[in-house]
Curated annotation (Swiss-Prot):
It comes from the Bacteria. Belongs to the aerobic coproporphyrinogen-III oxidase family. Its EC number is 1.3.3.3. It is found in: Cytoplasm. Substrate binds at residues 100, 116-118, 266-268. This is Oxygen-dependent coproporphyrinogen-III oxidase. GO terms for biological process: protoporphyrinogen IX biosynthetic process. GO terms for molecular function: coproporphyrinogen oxidase activity; metal ion binding; protein homodimerization activity. The gene is hemF. The active site is at residue 114. One of its GO terms (cellular component) is cytoplasm. Residues 248-283 are annotated as: Important for dimerization. It catalyses: coproporphyrinogen III + O2 + 2 H(+) = protoporphyrinogen IX + 2 CO2 + 2 H2O. Its cofactor is a divalent metal cation. It comes from Francisella philomiragia subsp. philomiragia (strain ATCC 25017 / CCUG 19701 / FSC 153 / O#319-036).
Protein backbone atom coordinates (compact mmCIF):
# COMPACT_ATOMS: atom_id res chain seq x y z
CA UNK A 1 0.00 0.00 0.00
CA UNK A 2 2.85 2.41 0.77
CA UNK A 3 4.12 1.99 -2.79
CA UNK A 4 0.68 2.82 -4.22
CA UNK A 5 0.40 5.91 -2.02
CA UNK A 6 3.81 7.08 -3.21
CA UNK A 7 2.77 6.52 -6.83
CA UNK A 8 -0.27 8.76 -6.32
CA UNK A 9 1.85 11.32 -4.48
CA UNK A 10 4.25 11.50 -7.42
CA UNK A 11 1.32 12.03 -9.80
CA UNK A 12 0.00 14.87 -7.63
CA UNK A 13 3.37 16.61 -7.53
CA UNK A 14 3.52 16.53 -11.34
CA UNK A 15 -0.12 17.69 -11.54
CA UNK A 16 0.66 20.70 -9.36
CA UNK A 17 3.49 21.76 -11.66
CA UNK A 18 1.38 21.21 -14.78
CA UNK A 19 -1.55 23.28 -13.48
CA UNK A 20 0.55 26.18 -12.20
CA UNK A 21 2.64 26.44 -15.36
CA UNK A 22 -0.48 26.33 -17.57
CA UNK A 23 -2.25 29.00 -15.53
CA UNK A 24 0.85 31.19 -15.75
CA UNK A 25 0.58 31.03 -19.54
CA UNK A 26 -2.90 32.61 -19.29
CA UNK A 27 -1.65 35.34 -16.93
CA UNK A 28 -0.78 38.54 -18.83
CA UNK A 29 1.23 40.23 -16.06
CA UNK A 30 4.57 39.25 -14.55
CA UNK A 31 2.82 37.55 -11.61
CA UNK A 32 4.00 33.98 -11.04
CA UNK A 33 3.21 31.18 -8.64
CA UNK A 34 5.59 31.17 -5.70
CA UNK A 35 6.41 27.95 -3.90
CA UNK A 36 6.09 27.68 -0.12
CA UNK A 37 7.37 24.29 0.98
CA UNK A 38 6.64 23.26 4.56
CA UNK A 39 7.15 20.35 6.92
CA UNK A 40 5.48 19.47 10.19
CA UNK A 41 7.92 18.33 12.88
CA UNK A 42 7.71 14.63 13.71
CA UNK A 43 7.30 15.06 17.46
CA UNK A 44 4.97 13.30 19.94
CA UNK A 45 2.97 16.45 20.71
CA UNK A 46 2.35 17.16 17.00
CA UNK A 47 -1.09 15.74 16.06
CA UNK A 48 -0.50 15.97 12.32
CA UNK A 49 2.84 15.17 10.72
CA UNK A 50 3.95 15.47 7.13
CA UNK A 51 4.93 17.94 4.45
CA UNK A 52 3.60 19.90 1.53
CA UNK A 53 4.09 22.62 -1.04
CA UNK A 54 1.64 25.51 -1.32
CA UNK A 55 1.99 27.39 -4.60
CA UNK A 56 0.38 30.84 -4.57
CA UNK A 57 -0.18 33.55 -7.17
CA UNK A 58 -1.34 37.01 -6.10
CA UNK A 59 -1.91 40.37 -7.74
CA UNK A 60 -2.07 39.20 -11.34
CA UNK A 61 -4.02 40.92 -14.09
CA UNK A 62 -5.94 37.71 -14.80
CA UNK A 63 -5.62 35.82 -11.52
CA UNK A 64 -6.15 38.10 -8.54
CA UNK A 65 -5.29 35.18 -6.28
CA UNK A 66 -4.86 31.46 -6.71
CA UNK A 67 -3.51 28.54 -4.74
CA UNK A 68 -2.53 25.05 -5.85
CA UNK A 69 -1.58 23.18 -2.69
CA UNK A 70 -0.04 19.73 -2.35
CA UNK A 71 0.22 17.91 0.97
CA UNK A 72 1.00 14.50 2.39
CA UNK A 73 0.16 14.14 6.06
CA UNK A 74 -0.29 11.35 8.56
CA UNK A 75 -1.50 11.02 12.11
CA UNK A 76 -2.17 8.52 14.87
CA UNK A 77 -5.95 9.00 14.89
CA UNK A 78 -8.44 10.28 12.32
CA UNK A 79 -10.19 13.51 13.40
CA UNK A 80 -14.00 13.57 13.88
CA UNK A 81 -14.66 15.15 10.47
CA UNK A 82 -13.13 12.12 8.73
CA UNK A 83 -15.06 9.51 10.73
CA UNK A 84 -18.49 11.17 10.89
CA UNK A 85 -19.85 8.65 8.38
CA UNK A 86 -17.42 5.85 9.28
CA UNK A 87 -17.53 5.36 13.01
CA UNK A 88 -15.59 2.10 12.68
CA UNK A 89 -12.52 4.12 11.67
CA UNK A 90 -12.47 6.26 14.81
CA UNK A 91 -9.06 6.14 16.43
CA UNK A 92 -7.27 4.57 13.46
CA UNK A 93 -3.99 5.91 12.14
CA UNK A 94 -4.16 7.52 8.71
CA UNK A 95 -2.29 8.85 5.71
CA UNK A 96 -3.80 11.53 3.47
CA UNK A 97 -2.27 13.02 0.36
CA UNK A 98 -3.86 15.36 -2.14
CA UNK A 99 -3.86 18.48 -4.27
CA UNK A 100 -6.41 21.20 -3.67
CA UNK A 101 -6.75 24.36 -5.72
CA UNK A 102 -8.88 27.48 -5.88
CA UNK A 103 -8.47 30.15 -8.55
CA UNK A 104 -9.96 33.63 -7.99
CA UNK A 105 -9.82 35.65 -11.24
CA UNK A 106 -9.78 39.45 -11.22
CA UNK A 107 -12.34 39.86 -14.02
CA UNK A 108 -15.91 39.26 -12.74
CA UNK A 109 -16.79 37.60 -16.06
CA UNK A 110 -14.26 34.82 -15.43
CA UNK A 111 -15.61 32.26 -12.95
CA UNK A 112 -13.82 31.03 -9.88
CA UNK A 113 -12.83 27.38 -10.08
CA UNK A 114 -12.03 24.79 -7.44
CA UNK A 115 -10.63 21.28 -7.71
CA UNK A 116 -9.43 18.65 -5.27
CA UNK A 117 -7.98 15.17 -5.70
CA UNK A 118 -6.95 13.07 -2.72
CA UNK A 119 -6.55 9.65 -1.14
CA UNK A 120 -7.11 8.61 2.45
CA UNK A 121 -5.73 5.41 3.89
CA UNK A 122 -6.79 4.36 7.38
CA UNK A 123 -4.70 1.78 9.17
CA UNK A 124 -1.97 1.89 6.53
CA UNK A 125 0.38 0.30 9.05
CA UNK A 126 -1.92 -2.73 9.50
CA UNK A 127 -2.53 -5.88 7.47
CA UNK A 128 -5.94 -4.59 6.37
CA UNK A 129 -5.67 -0.92 5.38
CA UNK A 130 -8.86 0.82 4.27
CA UNK A 131 -8.44 3.23 1.36
CA UNK A 132 -10.69 5.61 -0.51
CA UNK A 133 -10.30 8.38 -3.06
CA UNK A 134 -12.09 11.71 -3.16
CA UNK A 135 -12.19 14.78 -5.31
CA UNK A 136 -13.79 16.56 -8.23
CA UNK A 137 -14.04 20.07 -9.63
CA UNK A 138 -16.69 22.79 -9.54
CA UNK A 139 -17.28 26.20 -11.11
CA UNK A 140 -18.56 29.42 -9.51
CA UNK A 141 -19.55 32.09 -12.06
CA UNK A 142 -20.49 35.64 -11.12
CA UNK A 143 -21.88 36.60 -14.52
CA UNK A 144 -22.74 33.23 -16.04
CA UNK A 145 -22.59 32.15 -19.67
CA UNK A 146 -24.61 29.06 -20.49
CA UNK A 147 -22.06 27.81 -23.01
CA UNK A 148 -19.36 27.88 -20.31
CA UNK A 149 -21.43 25.75 -17.93
CA UNK A 150 -22.22 23.32 -20.75
CA UNK A 151 -18.53 23.04 -21.69
CA UNK A 152 -17.58 22.50 -18.02
CA UNK A 153 -20.14 19.74 -17.54
CA UNK A 154 -19.51 18.13 -20.93
CA UNK A 155 -15.81 17.83 -20.08
CA UNK A 156 -16.75 16.25 -16.75
CA UNK A 157 -19.17 13.82 -18.39
CA UNK A 158 -16.70 12.81 -21.10
CA UNK A 159 -14.08 11.79 -18.56
CA UNK A 160 -16.61 9.96 -16.39
CA UNK A 161 -18.10 8.03 -19.31
CA UNK A 162 -14.67 6.62 -20.16
CA UNK A 163 -14.81 4.76 -16.86
CA UNK A 164 -18.43 4.26 -15.80
CA UNK A 165 -21.61 5.71 -17.31
CA UNK A 166 -23.14 5.97 -13.85
CA UNK A 167 -20.38 8.25 -12.54
CA UNK A 168 -21.40 11.56 -14.10
CA UNK A 169 -25.06 11.67 -12.98
CA UNK A 170 -24.08 10.37 -9.55
CA UNK A 171 -21.10 12.69 -8.98
CA UNK A 172 -22.92 15.69 -10.47
CA UNK A 173 -25.76 15.18 -7.99
CA UNK A 174 -23.30 14.83 -5.13
CA UNK A 175 -21.62 18.07 -6.24
CA UNK A 176 -24.92 19.97 -6.29
CA UNK A 177 -25.72 18.65 -2.82
CA UNK A 178 -22.29 19.23 -1.31
CA UNK A 179 -21.65 22.80 -2.51
CA UNK A 180 -24.87 24.07 -0.99
CA UNK A 181 -25.16 26.80 1.63
CA UNK A 182 -28.00 25.64 3.86
CA UNK A 183 -28.35 28.96 5.67
CA UNK A 184 -28.69 30.81 2.34
CA UNK A 185 -30.66 28.11 0.49
CA UNK A 186 -28.23 28.59 -2.40
CA UNK A 187 -25.80 26.44 -4.33
CA UNK A 188 -22.28 27.86 -4.47
CA UNK A 189 -22.08 27.71 -8.26
CA UNK A 190 -23.03 25.58 -11.26
CA UNK A 191 -21.40 22.46 -9.85
CA UNK A 192 -19.40 19.85 -11.68
CA UNK A 193 -18.16 16.63 -10.07
CA UNK A 194 -17.81 15.64 -6.44
CA UNK A 195 -17.00 12.18 -5.13
CA UNK A 196 -15.92 10.86 -1.77
CA UNK A 197 -15.40 7.37 -0.36
CA UNK A 198 -14.57 6.15 -3.88
CA UNK A 199 -13.50 2.52 -3.62
CA UNK A 200 -16.26 0.77 -5.60
CA UNK A 201 -13.74 -0.75 -8.02
CA UNK A 202 -10.18 -2.02 -7.70
CA UNK A 203 -7.49 0.34 -6.48
CA UNK A 204 -5.94 0.57 -9.94
CA UNK A 205 -9.29 1.36 -11.59
CA UNK A 206 -10.10 4.06 -9.04
CA UNK A 207 -6.56 5.43 -9.35
CA UNK A 208 -6.94 5.71 -13.14
CA UNK A 209 -10.31 7.46 -12.88
CA UNK A 210 -9.07 10.02 -10.36
CA UNK A 211 -5.91 10.80 -12.33
CA UNK A 212 -7.90 11.14 -15.58
CA UNK A 213 -10.33 13.43 -13.78
CA UNK A 214 -7.47 15.53 -12.42
CA UNK A 215 -5.88 15.83 -15.85
CA UNK A 216 -9.18 17.06 -17.34
CA UNK A 217 -9.46 20.09 -15.02
CA UNK A 218 -7.39 22.32 -17.29
CA UNK A 219 -9.37 21.17 -20.34
CA UNK A 220 -12.51 22.30 -18.54
CA UNK A 221 -11.25 25.63 -17.18
CA UNK A 222 -8.64 27.19 -19.48
CA UNK A 223 -10.94 27.64 -22.53
CA UNK A 224 -13.37 29.58 -20.30
CA UNK A 225 -10.58 31.78 -18.92
CA UNK A 226 -9.28 32.57 -22.40
CA UNK A 227 -12.75 33.37 -23.71
CA UNK A 228 -13.72 35.74 -20.87
CA UNK A 229 -10.53 37.29 -19.47
CA UNK A 230 -10.52 40.35 -21.75
CA UNK A 231 -14.19 41.33 -21.35
CA UNK A 232 -14.48 44.92 -20.13
CA UNK A 233 -16.16 45.36 -16.76
CA UNK A 234 -17.34 48.20 -14.54
CA UNK A 235 -17.07 48.87 -10.81
CA UNK A 236 -20.64 47.60 -10.49
CA UNK A 237 -19.52 44.24 -11.90
CA UNK A 238 -16.56 44.14 -9.52
CA UNK A 239 -18.74 45.02 -6.52
CA UNK A 240 -21.08 42.13 -7.31
CA UNK A 241 -18.15 39.74 -7.67
CA UNK A 242 -16.90 40.76 -4.22
CA UNK A 243 -20.38 40.32 -2.76
CA UNK A 244 -20.72 36.82 -4.22
CA UNK A 245 -17.22 35.93 -3.01
CA UNK A 246 -18.66 36.33 0.47
CA UNK A 247 -20.68 33.18 -0.19
CA UNK A 248 -17.42 31.40 -1.01
CA UNK A 249 -15.97 32.41 2.34
CA UNK A 250 -19.11 31.32 4.20
CA UNK A 251 -19.06 27.88 2.58
CA UNK A 252 -15.37 27.28 3.22
CA UNK A 253 -15.54 28.22 6.90
CA UNK A 254 -18.89 26.64 7.77
CA UNK A 255 -19.31 23.56 5.56
CA UNK A 256 -16.14 22.54 3.74
CA UNK A 257 -14.92 19.17 5.03
CA UNK A 258 -11.36 19.76 3.90
CA UNK A 259 -11.11 23.02 5.83
CA UNK A 260 -12.70 21.47 8.91
CA UNK A 261 -10.49 18.36 8.66
CA UNK A 262 -7.35 20.47 8.39
CA UNK A 263 -8.21 22.65 11.36
CA UNK A 264 -9.40 19.73 13.53
CA UNK A 265 -6.29 17.67 12.81
CA UNK A 266 -3.82 20.44 13.56
CA UNK A 267 -2.99 21.15 9.94
CA UNK A 268 -1.06 24.12 8.63
CA UNK A 269 -3.47 27.03 9.01
CA UNK A 270 -1.76 29.27 6.44
CA UNK A 271 -2.18 26.61 3.76
CA UNK A 272 -5.71 25.64 4.81
CA UNK A 273 -6.98 29.22 4.57
CA UNK A 274 -4.96 30.15 1.48
CA UNK A 275 -7.98 29.37 -0.69
CA UNK A 276 -9.81 32.42 0.67
CA UNK A 277 -10.40 35.23 -1.85
CA UNK A 278 -8.18 38.31 -1.54
CA UNK A 279 -11.24 40.52 -1.01
CA UNK A 280 -14.92 39.90 -0.28
CA UNK A 281 -17.81 42.03 0.93
CA UNK A 282 -21.10 41.60 2.77
CA UNK A 283 -24.09 43.92 2.37
CA UNK A 284 -27.04 43.83 4.74
CA UNK A 285 -30.15 42.33 3.10
CA UNK A 286 -28.95 43.22 -0.40
CA UNK A 287 -31.15 42.12 -3.31
CA UNK A 288 -30.39 42.36 -7.05
CA UNK A 289 -32.59 44.53 -9.22
CA UNK A 290 -35.33 42.52 -10.98
CA UNK A 291 -34.28 41.64 -14.51
CA UNK A 292 -30.65 42.70 -13.95
CA UNK A 293 -27.48 40.84 -14.92
CA UNK A 294 -26.90 40.25 -11.22
CA UNK A 295 -30.26 38.56 -10.73
CA UNK A 296 -29.52 36.10 -13.53
CA UNK A 297 -26.86 34.25 -11.52
CA UNK A 298 -29.42 33.14 -8.95
CA UNK A 299 -31.21 31.13 -11.63
CA UNK A 300 -27.99 29.63 -12.95
CA UNK A 301 -26.79 28.32 -9.61
CA UNK A 302 -29.84 26.11 -9.18
CA UNK A 303 -29.20 22.43 -9.99
CA UNK A 304 -30.09 21.65 -13.58
CA UNK A 305 -29.26 19.26 -16.39
CA UNK A 306 -26.63 21.17 -18.35
CA UNK A 307 -26.19 18.48 -20.99
CA UNK A 308 -29.32 18.01 -23.07
Amino acid sequence: MQEKITQFENFLAQLQQKITSTLEQSETSSAKFISDKWQKPDTPEQKLKGYGNSMIIEGGEIFEKGVVAFSRVHGDALPPSATAKRQELAGKSFIATGVSLVIHPRNPFVPTSHANFRIFVAGADTDNPIWWFGGGFDLTPYYPFEEDAIHWHQTAKNICDKHDASYYPSFKKLCDEYFYLKHRDECRGVGGLFFDDLNDKSFDECFKFVTDCANSYLDAYIPIVEKRKNIEYSQKHKDFQLYRRGRYVEFNLVFDRGTIFGLQSGGRTESILSSMPPMATWKYNWQPEPGSEEEKVYEYIKPRDWIK
